[in-house]
Amino acid sequence: MTAPSMSRPDDVRPEVLDFKPYVPGLSIDEIRDRFGLADVVKLASNENPLGTSPVVQRTLKTKADLAFRYAQSGNPRLTRAIAAHHGVAPERVVAGNGSDEIIDLLIRVRATPGKHNIVAFRPCFSIYELQAKFCGLEFRQADLRPDFTFDWDAFLAATDENTAIAFVTTPDNPSGWCPPVSELEHVARTLPPSCLFVIDEAYMDFCGDEAAHSLLSRLDAFPNIAVLRTFSKSFGLAGLRLGYGILPERLADYLHRVRLPFSVNILAEEAGLAALEDTVFRSETLRVTAEGRAYIAEGLTALGCEVLPSWANFIMFRPPTDATDLFEALLRRGIIIRPLKSYGLPQHLRVSMGNADENRRFIAACKEILPHA
C-alpha cells in the first residue's frame, strides 16, 4: 500500500516553482552605495523628468490627515474625472493600483488555465508574460520585424479561437515604436471574435498626435477593445501606483466585482484628481520630454549609436561598443540607464528622457566613454 503524499505548509503551485520575478531598474540608493557617489542621475525607469506636480504635492500635504480612512469603494470621484478627461462613460473606467493591476485582473477574469492562451509580441512588457504564466496559461509571442516595427501577420497568426487576450503596447516598450491607428483598426477587426484586444497606452501621452495613433476615441466601433493608461509617466505619480483601464462596460463591471477592496488608496486617489487638474505641469512635461528626446537622439547618433525612432519618453539604441560595458561605465559615473538583456536584446540599451541638465550629463558621459565614435 502506497503511503499518502504529505503536503507541507510551504508547498506552492507548480507555476511558482520556476517563476522569474519582474526585474526593475536599479535605484539611486543602490548606485550611491555601490560606488560611493553623492549625486546619481536615474534615466532607467521612464519616470517624469520634472518630478511631481506642485499641485499634487500641495494636495498630498493638505489631504495627509485622511490617511487613516479607506477610499470610497470603486473610487467613483476619480473614475468620473478620468472618464471626463477622455470623453468616455464612467461605467467603462476601472482604476487600479497601477495599470499592472488591470492587466492582472483582465488575465484572471478572461482566461481559463488549460483552455485559453495569451498573445503578445516579442519582446514586450514583461508583466503580460509573468502574469499569464503565474495563472497557468499558455503564453504565445510573435516576433517583431528586424526594424522593431510590428509584424501584424505574425501576431494574428499566433491567435486562435482560444486566445483570451492579445496584448500590444503602443508606443512600444522598449523600442518606442508607435503604429498608425489604421493598423490597430485592422487588427481589431481581424482578431477572433472572442479575443479581447488590450492596447496598453502607458506612453501614448508622448506620441504627439493621439488621434493618429490611438483607438481610444473610437471604442464604440470596436467592442473587443480595452485601453490601458497610467498616472506614472506624464502625470508623475509612479510611486503612488495609479493606473486605469477603459473597457467594455460589462467587462468593467466584472473587474469591479472581483478586485481586491481599496487597492487604490485614498491619497493616490486625491493625487490623481489633482494631477488631472494640473494641465500646466502636464503640458510642460510633454514639452521637456519632446525636447529631450530630440537632443538625446541627436547626441547618440553623433556618437555612432544606432538610434531607433521613438514616440515615447525613452529611446532605445545600440552603441558602437559593447552595451554592457557602456552601461557599467555610465553607472560608475552615476548615471543609470536600462540594459535590455532581459528583453532578449543584450546589445541594446534604453535611456529615459530626464530634465535638460540630466540629459546633458548623459550625453557628456557618453562622449567620455565613446571618444572614438
UniProtKB/Swiss-Prot annotation:
PROSITE patterns assigned to the protein according to its UniProt record, in alphabetical order: AA_TRANSFER_CLASS_2
Gene3D superfamilies: Aspartate Aminotransferase, domain 1, Type I PLP-dependent aspartate aminotransferase-like (Major domain)
Database matches in InterPro entries: Aminotrans_II_pyridoxalP_BS, Aminotransferase_I/II_large, HisP_aminotrans, HistidinolP_aminotransfase, PyrdxlP-dep_Trfase, PyrdxlP-dep_Trfase_major, PyrdxlP-dep_Trfase_small
Alphabetic keyword roster: Amino-acid biosynthesis, Aminotransferase, Histidine biosynthesis, Pyridoxal phosphate, Transferase
One Pfam family hit: Aminotran_1_2
Record field: catalytic activity: L-histidinol phosphate + 2-oxoglutarate = 3-(imidazol-4-yl)-2-oxopropyl phosphate + L-glutamate
Subunit and partners: Homodimer.
Family statement: Belongs to the class-II pyridoxal-phosphate-dependent aminotransferase family. Histidinol-phosphate aminotransferase subfamily.
Listed name of the protein: Histidinol-phosphate aminotransferase
Source species: Nitratidesulfovibrio vulgaris (strain DP4) (Desulfovibrio vulgaris)
Gene for this chain: hisC
